[in-house]
């Protein structure tokens, strides 16, 4: 973590993208997957990993960060000029003096904080490419994707990774959309506007239709209040996905888990294992509708308004001490 403490195993994403052993084992697994399933007639695409996120502050990552900076700046003089290091006596005189921003170390050098976020994106993409390489070697014509995310109940673009850069490395965009319908914080119309906006943004990442890789047919388990969709809401929200450029409406999860942290997350098949409840019936209805609207698959959408969203700029403004911002 950012206190340079080695964490115990647990939670999610408890791996290091820099670990040579982890990379080696992932390559072996993916090679075997490609060899076994690569020419199966049911294979449509490869889904790589799951919801990339997080950073690591281990010795491997620190060294990779220093190397990344050396490649970017070339000299310490250039780095100090970019980071304005002499202010507060932060001049770097050796590459080994540089660590990632830390809760127990440096955290006030604006350029360093910004470069760390850029590095995290680049390192994540590099790991994605390492995962993809054995698959592409065996199945060069099978597309690859990974599931992007949104941030928080407000459905803001995911903050921690530059999806604009990441999008160049996937064959198609897919993402996990979990709006908290019927919440007390905003109207259904306001939330629908947020859903529409972020769908438009993710469609624009590659200027082509995308996939909804995860959605819930009922409620989620991680909002403050997790309400089941009202009758008809699942159909309405599913059609909104299509109207904004999605070619799918996939679900997490198909069957509710018997235990652990997401046992109450919505699913197509509930704990009662029944096809008679309203949620299952509405999922079936959406499936029938998708069959009827096959003609819209792959449709282009012409945008009449252009907007710029820049992850670099967002990070920079958020980290600029004293910059006047409004919540």
Please place each PLM-identified region on the residue numbering.
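Polysaccharide-binding and catalytic clefts of secreted carbohydrate-active enzymes
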Residues: 2-172, 176-188, 192-197
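Carbohydrate-binding surfaces of carbohydrate-active enzymes
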Residues: 98, 171, 175-327
